[in-house]
Amino acid sequence: MNILKVGMVQQSCSNDIPANIEKLKSNIRKCAELGAQLVVLQELHNSVYFCQHEEAALCDLAEPIPGPSTETYGALAKELGIVLVLSLFERRTAGIYHNTAVVIEKDGSIAGKYRKMHIPDDPCYYEKFYFTPGDMGFQPIETSVGTLGVLVCWDQWYPEAARCMALNGAQMLIYPTAIGGVYTDPVEEQKVQSDAWQLVQRGHSVANGLPVITVNRTGQEDDPTGNTKGIKFWGRSFATGPQGELLAEFGNDEEGVKVVEIDLDRTEYVRRGWPFFRDRRIDAYGETILKRYGK
C-alpha cells in the first residue's frame, strides 16, 4: 500500500477577502494537524464567486502567478510541509485573465499550474466574460506526493479531460469547484443536478481507474445586481477510490475539513481487473471523437 492523506477544505465565502483567506489558512492548518500531506481548496477560494454578473471592474481581483496568493499560501505550505492545490483568478497580461489552479510544493515553490479549459456561459455562471480558455493542455503536475491531474469545475463534466489526464500519467484527478443551484431551476431539479454532478465524476474515477478529489464551496451567495436569487452552492465535496467508491463526503451546508486516506497503489490492482485502457479501440474511433456536434 502507498497511502496518501488528502485534506479537503469546504467553506463559505464572504465579500471580505482577508477574512476568507484567514479562514482558509486556519482550515489548512487543521488538515495538517490531522496528518494531511496534500490539501485541496475550492475554486476561486479567496473571494465570493463573482461570475454571477458581468462587471469589468471585477477584473481588479485578478493577480499574477507568481504573486500575492502564491507567496501567502506558499509560506504556509512550507511551514506545514504540505502540498497545496490553489484556485486563483490569474492576470496573464492586460485584458487577458485565466481561471487557474496552482500546485504549491512542500518547500513553498510552485510545482505547476493548470488553466481551466472548459469555460461556461450560463445564467449566474458568466465565466466567458472573465476567463480566457486555457492553453496548457491536460498535463499532470509532478509533486513530492504524486502526479496530480488537476482540472477545474466545469472540466468535470467532460470525460475527455479526465481521460487525457489519465493517459498522461495522472495518479489522481483533482477538481477545485464552485457549483450550485440557480433560481431558474426548481428544488427537485437541483437535487437531480447535484446527484448527476457527483455521479459523472465517480464515472471518471471508474473509467480511468483513478481516485477523484472534488472540493466545492458551500453557502448562499447573492446576486449583487439583485436580478436573480443568486446561487445556493451544493457543497458535497467528496473523494473516491479508483472504482468510484465514496471514501468521504461533506454535507450540503457543512463547513470544515476532512482528511481521507488514498491508496495510490490500488490503481494497479483495479486496472488489472478492469483493463479499460488495454481494450480501447483507438484504431476505430477515428475523427468521430473530434466532431463538435455529432451528425
Task: Please provide the spans of the model-predicted regions.
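Active-site-proximal beta-strand elements of phosphoester/diester hydrolases
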Residues: I3-C13, T100, K113, P140, ...
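Short beta-strand scaffold segments in enzyme catalytic cores
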Residues: L86-L88, T100-V103, Q139, S237-A239, ...
